[in-house]
Amino acid sequence: MKVESVMPPAVSSVVLVVDDAPDTLRMLCDALAIEGYTVLVARDAIEALERFEMAVPDAVLLDAIMPGENGFALCRRLKSEPSWAHVPVIFMTGLAETEQIVEGFASGGVDYVVKPLKIPEVLARLATHLRNAHVSRLAREAVDVAG
């Protein structure tokens, strides 16, 4: 099913999807690929860090509950690394209590989507955060050039 695009990805933005649920991975990967994104997959924090070492994605869709290190702890690690801190992290999880949502933002997430996922909503949020990150990067580069 083709979802109406909110905004086409800028030159095939790279999105890392981190989730241990095969059905969620399949659904997200299919939808992202249809929209023109390049998709990287990780099933846990260790794999996610390995993907970051290979290629820094433009955004991360991150489950909070995974085997081993949870998504909140992984997000904190990503945000503590200067070369990765700019990457927007969108949590997607079944944890719906206010304290859990607040923890997602406190750990460095820019957004929080409660499962079950609504693909058009996830795509719209992702496009917005990618656009905001792009504008922020351009501003940082302009300041760097201006000195």
Question: What is the role of each PLM region?
Answer:
Residues 26, 73, 85, 96-111:
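Alpha4 helix (beta4-alpha4-beta5 surface) of REC/receiver domains from two-component response regulators
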Residues 55-62:
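Active-site beta3 strand of CheY-like receiver
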Residues 43-47, 70-74, 96:
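Acidic catalytic/metal-coordinating carboxylates
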Residues 117-130:
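C-terminal output helix
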Residues 66:
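Receiver (REC) domain active-site loop signature in two-component systems and cognate sites
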Residues 26-34:
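Charged docking surfaces used in two-component/phosphorelay signaling
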Residues 1-16, 131-133, 137-147:
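Non-catalytic signal-transmission and effector/linker regions of two-component phosphorelay proteins
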